From Swiss-Prot:
It comes from Treponema pallidum (strain Nichols). A lipid is attached at C22 (N-palmitoyl cysteine). Transmembrane segments: none annotated. Its main location: membrane. SUPFAM superfamilies: TPR-like (SSF48452). The keyword Cell membrane applies. This is Uncharacterized lipoprotein TP_0449.
């Protein structure tokens, strides 16, 4: 095949694929956009991922998943304001969804909305009081909100549930934050190496 034939074949291929793509509504391309966005995330090309998640979100069938992943990518870029705005409609539509509520709470906390995040983490904990992840998240946010005594008392009550190695590691990290953040006389009765 010579150069002229290759060029003609390329034009024919371009015209042929363009003809079918033009007749295809953009929302039906949502699966491809979603997959492209995911691939861009894997390549750490977050701006492109954001663009394709937004395109995928135009299709109602992909809206929730694309919007959630868009917010996640915003978080990876430390764009917490956009992440909060992306997650808020999802949370408003389904506040009982623990995955969305936890992501929204984390974005709020990272954006500096500590009071709102604390309320959400408290609600998440109250829904599932034996979930060690929820216990540790709530305790960590209490420390972040400078509610140190409340955090110590809460951890003392829940310590018996925190027996897994990872839970103990996170607990020790929270205790270190308490010790670093609070004058010793304020927590002397609450925190000791043996007590927590």
């Amino acid at each position: 095949m010579n150069g002229k034939q290759c060029f003609c074949f390329f034009l024919f291929h371009l015209f042929y694929t363009g003809l079918f793509a033009c007749g295809k509504p953009e929302s039906s391309l949502a699966p491809e956009y979603f997959d492209l966005a995911h691939a861009y995330v894997q390549l750490h090309r977050y701006d492109e991922a954001r663009d394709y998640y937004m395109r995928a979100a135009r299709d109602p069938a992909y809206y929730h998943a694309a919007q959630y992943n868009f917010a996640r990518v915003c978080g990876l870029q430390n764009d917490w304001k956009t992440a909060v705005h992306a997650l808020q409609p999802l949370y408003d539509a389904d506040s009982a969804n623990a995955t969305i509520a936890a992501a929204y709470a984390y974005a709020l906390l990272s954006f500096g909305e500590t009071a709102r995040a604390l309320l959400l983490y408290q609600q998440l904990y109250e829904r599932d009081q034996k979930n060690t992840q929820r216990i540790l998240e709530y305790a960590n946010v209490l420390v972040h909100a400078k509610k140190y005594i409340q955090a110590v008392e809460f951890l003392r009550q829940k310590k018996s549930l925190l027996s897994e190695a990872e839970d103990v590691r996170v607990l020790q990290s929270i205790v270190r934050k308490l010790k670093d953040s609070v004058p010793p006389h304020l927590i002397a009765d609450f925190v000791s190496t043996d007590d927590l």
